[in-house]
């Protein structure tokens, strides 16, 4: 075998080894799930999540808790 043939065989072997080693890397990649980023959107807001109602509900819970912890003055 001459030197050029040996060099050609060596380069071919290196390319084949690189191709074999790099193939599993691309197979490990997985696309992320769609998660309904387009579907399932609602045009109107849900009345349960309106900012005014949320604040009113939080205040109501706080008033009830404070009334239970700090009762009013006793009447004689």
UniProtKB/Swiss-Prot annotation:
This chain belongs to the protein called FMRFamide-related neuropeptides
> In which tissues is this gene expressed?
Olfactory lobe and accessory lobe, olfactory globular tract, olfactory lobe cells (at protein level). Widely distributed throughout nervous system.
Q: Which UniProt keywords apply?
A: Amidation, Cleavage on pair of basic residues, Neuropeptide, Secreted, Signal
Could you say which residues form the signal peptide?
1-27
Identify residues that carry Phenylalanine amide.
Answer: 39
Q: What does this protein do?
A: GYRKPPFNGSIF-amide may be involved in olfaction and contraction of hindgut.
Q: Which GO terms describe its biological process?
A: neuropeptide signaling pathway
Give the UniProt entry's GO cellular component terms.
extracellular region
Concerning its family, UniProt says:
Belongs to the FARP (FMRFamide related peptide) family.
Organism per entry: Procambarus clarkii (Red swamp crayfish)
The disulfides recorded in the entry are none
Do the record's keywords include Secreted? yes
The domain of life is Eukaryota
Subcellular location(s) of the protein:
Secreted
On whether Signal is a keyword of this UniProt record, the answer is yes
């Amino acid at each position: 075998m001459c030197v050029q043939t040996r060099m050609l065989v060596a380069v071919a072997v290196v390319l084949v080894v690189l191709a074999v080693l790099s193939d599993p890397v691309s197979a490990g990649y997985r696309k992320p799930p769609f998660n309904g980023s387009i579907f399932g959107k609602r045009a109107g807001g849900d009345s349960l999540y309106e900012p005014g109602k949320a604040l009113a509900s939080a205040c109501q819970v706080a008033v009830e808790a404070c009334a239970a912890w700090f009762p009013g003055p006793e009447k004689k």
